[in-house]
UniProtKB/Swiss-Prot annotation:
Organism: Enterobacter sp. (strain 638)
Reactions it catalyzes: a quinone + NADH + H(+) = a quinol + NAD(+); a quinone + NADPH + H(+) = a quinol + NADP(+)
Protein name: Glutathione-regulated potassium-efflux system ancillary protein KefG
Keyword Membrane: yes
NCBIfam families: PRK04930.1
Pfam families assigned to the protein according to its UniProt record, in alphabetical order: Flavodoxin_2 (PF02525)
Similarity comment: Belongs to the NAD(P)H dehydrogenase (quinone) family. KefG subfamily.
Membrane-protein topology: Peripheral membrane protein
Organism taxonomic ancestry: Bacteria, Pseudomonadati, Pseudomonadota, Gammaproteobacteria, Enterobacterales
Class of this enzyme: oxidoreductase
Keyword Iron: no
E.C. designation(s): 1.6.5.2
Gene name linked to the record: kefG
Keywords assigned: Cell inner membrane, Cell membrane, Membrane, NAD, Oxidoreductase
Oligomer and partners: Interacts with KefB.
Length: 183
């Protein structure tokens, strides 16, 4: 891709005002001209999703980033509703459902536990790669390229310098999200 990829950052946090980590991560994204930050809870507080509008946003972008906290081994309720309604059969899957084919999917996740909690012998009993498998499968169903997720573990307990480092790396990636040679 010779021009800068257009990124749609779907942000889903029901208590965004209380999430220091997510606010810090969003700052570089909000300063980049190739990134559209779309706060789902701000747009749809009543959960009535404008499906045609959302599908058009997806069509207009090359890379779709799903930024959210890990809630009960998944995503917040509004994002789950969004996934179920917007990524509909005939649009992104099934016969004729090729609107997202070839686009890129990246999950950017914040957690309340340390990385060590995501092991077979630890608190959550499964590694993050297993927990995120439904998202990876959804990307495959949509014929999208799954990109390695960015995970900020123990987000609430991150020191400001560590959060700033994550935000800097995230911003640099958002500025040029598609690796040379495709995926």
């Amino acid at each position: 891709m010779s021009q800068t990829a257009k990124v749609l950052l779907l942000y889903a946090h029901p208590e965004s005002q209380d999430s220091v980590a997510n606010r810090v991560l969003l700052k570089p994204a909000q300063q980049l001209s190739n990134v559209t930050v779309h706060d789902l809870y701000a747009h749809y507080p009543d959960f009535f999703i404008d499906i045609p509008r959302e599908q058009e946003l997806l069509r207009q972008h090359d890379v779709i980033v799903f930024q959210h906290p890990l809630y009960t081994y998944s995503c917040p309720a509004l994002l789950k509703e969004w996934l179920d309604r917007v990524l509909s059969r005939g649009f992104s899957s099934g016969p004729g459902g090729n609107q997202l084919a070839g686009k890129y999917w990246r999950s950017v996740i914040t957690t309340g536990e340390p990385e060590s909690a995501y092991r077979h012998d630890s608190l959550n009993r499964y590694p993050m790669s297993d927990i995120l498998r439904p998202f990876e499968l959804t990307a495959a169903m949509c014929r999208m390229h799954w990109m390695s997720p960015m995970i900020v573990y123990w987000a609430r307990r991150q020191q400001p310098q560590a959060l700033a480092s994550h935000a800097k790396a995230y911003g640099e990636w958002l500025a040029s999200p598609i690796p040379t040679g495709g995926h």
